[in-house]
Amino acid sequence: MSGEGENPASKPTPVQDVQGDGRWMSLHHRFVADSKDKEPEVVFIGDSLVQLMHQCEIWRELFSPLHALNFGIGGDSTQHVLWRLENGELEHIRPKIVVVWVGTNNHSHTAEQVTGGIKAIVQLVNKLQPQARVVVLGLLPRGQHPNPLREKNRQVNELVRAALAGYPRAHFLDADPGFVHSDGTISHHDMYDYLHLSRLGYTPVCRALHSLLLRLLAQDQGQGIPLPETAP
């Protein structure tokens, strides 16, 4: 990517197998194999927030009817998603929409670097799947109380929203329905460990996303109202 230099967040990199059980690579190979006989309308790719969504009833209610595939892996950062995309996870399918939700695990990277990583993912999806739209979900606030990572995620969202204005088939969706209370805290009812969503927390996120997906699919079928380049 021009202008990113040696940005580690935009350099495709596999996860280092520090535990020695090969699970990450096994999941990657399974995703590639599972996609060979599928015809999904929507593909989700990202970290644990994507992965755990698949276990909720709302996934079966909203996204299974779209023949959605879930390529979420816990702990993934932008550079790991880039590597997976470069190594076959979109090779055998032609989805209409690719949903990307990743970046909160890029702990050691600046907001600008994380934004560069997300932009690199969008560009790669555009290259590999030019017919597909890309929906980037905004990073959620994290931590029970205000903290630097929460602020960095907010900065990433601002930067990504602005950056995607230059991509006509990319859309940004602020996935936060208001998880931060007026006193600055996040409830464990919404995020059970103040990072991962509970079933209650997933509900408003998934319903807002589902509404956008239906609008985009209808628009591409000539039935919808034209959308701006980024969704509010």
From Swiss-Prot:
Main location class: cytoplasm
EC assignment: 3.1.1.47
Tissue expression per record: Expressed in brain, spleen, lung, liver, kidney and testis. Not expressed in heart and skeletal muscle. Expressed in fetal brain as heterodimer. Not expressed in adult tissues. Expressed exclusively in granule cells.
GO cellular component assignments: 1-alkyl-2-acetylglycerophosphocholine esterase complex; cytoplasm
InterPro entries in the record: SGNH_hydro, SGNH_hydro_sf
Positions of post-translational Phosphoserine modification: S2
Residue span of region Disordered: 1-20
Record-linked SUPFAM superfamilies: SGNH hydrolase
Alphabetized Gene3D superfamilies for the sequence: SGNH hydrolase
N-acetylserine found at: S2
Regulation (activators, inhibitors): Beta subunit (PAFAH1B1) inhibits the acetylhydrolase activity of the alpha1/alpha1 catalytic homodimer.
One Pfam family linked to the record: Lipase_GDSL_2
Function: Alpha1 catalytic subunit of the cytosolic type I platelet-activating factor (PAF) acetylhydrolase (PAF-AH (I)) heterotetrameric enzyme that catalyzes the hydrolyze of the acetyl group at the sn-2 position of PAF and its analogs and modulates the action of PAF. The activity and substrate specificity of PAF-AH (I) are affected by its subunit composition.
Protein name: Platelet-activating factor acetylhydrolase IB subunit alpha1
Organism listed in the record: Rattus norvegicus
